[in-house]
Amino acid sequence: MPLGDPSREGAEKLPATIRALGWTSFLTDLSSEAIYPLLPNFVKGLGGSAIDVGLLDGIANAVAAVVRLFAGGLSDRIGRRPLVIAGYGLSAVVRPAMGLVATPPAAVVVRAIDRFGKGIRSAPRDALVTDLVEPEVRGRAFGHIRALDHAGAALGPLVAMLFLLAFPGTERTLFLFTIVPGLVTLAVIGRFVRDPPRQAAAGGPTLATLTGAQWSLLGCVAVWALGAASELFLLRRAEDLGVAQPLVPLVWFGISGVKSVVAAWAGPLVDRLAPRRALVAGWLGFAAAYAGLAWSPSLPGAIACMLGVAAAYGVAEPAERALVAALSPAGRHGAAFGWYTLVQGLMALPAGLLAGWLWERGPD
């Protein structure tokens, strides 16, 4: 179960496919996040700058964004499972190649292909969750998956830290080993994930299919995403305030652990309060935590604000997905999640570049 999950019984009442998707997310993030916290220093060692760090995430997410849109619409026609398998499979095979790169551009390419895989699977997976559960428990279902996702993200950096403490300077070997949980992920999907019976939709994800409420939500998501710069900058801030590089994964463990705990509790809360209210609360908390981080000169204060950012994410993520599902017409859930993830991904590039530019030129 996710870290701090308050309702094991509630999770056990979820369909087996959703429980399997939760553990799939856990395994994927276990491998992905063992790498992620090490990337800023790794790119720096390859001769990269803070702008390269912004490009690493910005380009990767932007490339995946368009794929998410078409993958979501395609899943409305051919089913969710084939695209979920393809997306997880691509990432599992490509991610270990980070251990072979020699230049910052090569690192960007590997990261982009990894995120390309995420783009293929993200919208179909969330649409599959929507297909499988009733509206009154969508918050719980998305909270369960996000909690396990972040539990994997918490343990991945911890495994990386212990590995590097035992074998200093072997980051590339660690990257290569991430193929193991990736292959286990594919085995779980192949055994447990199934599409429910449903009628295939006609046509693709066109702008004409969006309702006024969906347009409003996408506009709000775009504004929020522009201010939500890559969390790699949180790790770089921790390093600047004195956290030793081998201990940086421990910071990421704390951030992801808080996300896991809060998402597990927030899922049922979203169902009770309504997704819109929970989403506003999460976004306001996010803004307040980032404002505190900007003004905190000490490491303890900065860490507290980073954990505040994590808590806000834990509330906002299941609320966003539950609201997207609630606003999407029947048979168009894949396209709806495709548009949602498209907006998130497209805003990642300007958000990353803006954060990198401010980092390079702003006050110390």
Labelled PLM ranges:
Residues 82-97, 179, 277-292:
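Structural signature of the two symmetry-related core transmembrane helices
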Residues 180-199:
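C-terminal membrane-cytosol helix-exit motif in multi-pass small-molecule transporters
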Residues 99-110, 294-305:
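Helix-loop junctions at membrane interfaces in 12-TM secondary transporters
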Residues 67-79, 164, 262-275, 359:
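Helix-to-loop junctions at the C-terminal end of transmembrane segments
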Residues 11-61, 214-251:
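Helix-loop boundary and gating motifs at the non-cytosolic
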Residues 164-180, 357-364:
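A membrane-interface helix-boundary motif in multi-pass transporters
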Residues 110-151, 323:
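Cytoplasmic helix-loop-helix junction between adjacent transmembrane helices
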Residues 61-69, 154, 256-264, 345-349:
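Residue-level signature of mid-helix packing/kink "hotspots" within the transmembrane helices
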